[in-house]
Regions:
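A short glycine-threonine-serine/GTX helix/turn-capping micro-motif
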Residues: 25-26, 43-52
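A non-catalytic, amphipathic alpha-helix used as a structural packing/dimerization or gating element
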Residues: 38-41, 59-62, 74-85, 158
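PLP-dependent enzyme catalytic core of the Aspartate aminotransferase-like
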Residues: 123-124, 135-171
């Protein structure tokens, strides 16, 4: 996001985590040399942390090289198409979300409703789990819909139809 808004030059610490989306562990921190030296010499958590094993460094390098590839750029473009499509279809169906990324939250507010809907959707072949209290604040139980570039537009559309039906009919 900082890159897209041309803000990199204004950021003191640029942290690039490699977990979850990066499929690995660890992170990169980009900063001025004086800040790097300060962290190395003064940060207790850094001082008493061991380095990642060499296999993790090699895996991270492999992942970063993949992220620079043409194939990855094509997949990223396809993912953004699916994000736009999904958000448009959710809006058309009156399903509210504040999300704008490939992980889309749909808040239902009720743990019991989430449990019933996730059971019904799994029986229909959708791999979905709700996020319930206490993992989220009271009355904000939700589904997190994760998109990837391999999901067909038809499957997204079918899922949204089923989700809408469940949201309208459960309780």
């Amino acid at each position: 996001m900082a890159y897209n808004f041309n803000l990199i030059k204004d950021i003191d610490f640029l942290v690039i985590p490699l977990g979850k989306g990066g499929g690995s562990v660890g992170a990169f921190v980009f900063c001025e040399k004086i800040l790097k030296e300060y962290i190395i010499n003064k940060s207790r958590k850094f001082i008493f942390t061991t380095a990642l094993p060499p296999v993790n460094h090699l895996w991270n390098l492999f992942i970063l090289n993949k992220m620079e590839s043409k194939e990855f750029a094509v997949k990223r473009k396809e993912l953004f198409k699916r994000i736009d499509f999904t958000l448009k279809k959710l809006k058309e169906k009156g399903i509210k979300t504040n999300s704008a990324s490939h992980i889309i939250s749909v808040v239902t507010g009720d743990n019991r409703k989430i449990i019933k809907i996730e059971k019904n959707l799994r029986e229909k072949g959708y791999f979905i789990y709700g996020v319930k209290e206490p993992a989220v604040p009271k009355n904000t139980a939700r589904f997190r819909i994760s998109l990837n570039p391999e999901i067909s537009f038809k499957n997204i559309e079918n899922f949204i139809e089923e989700l809408k039906y469940e949201l309208d009919t459960v309780f």
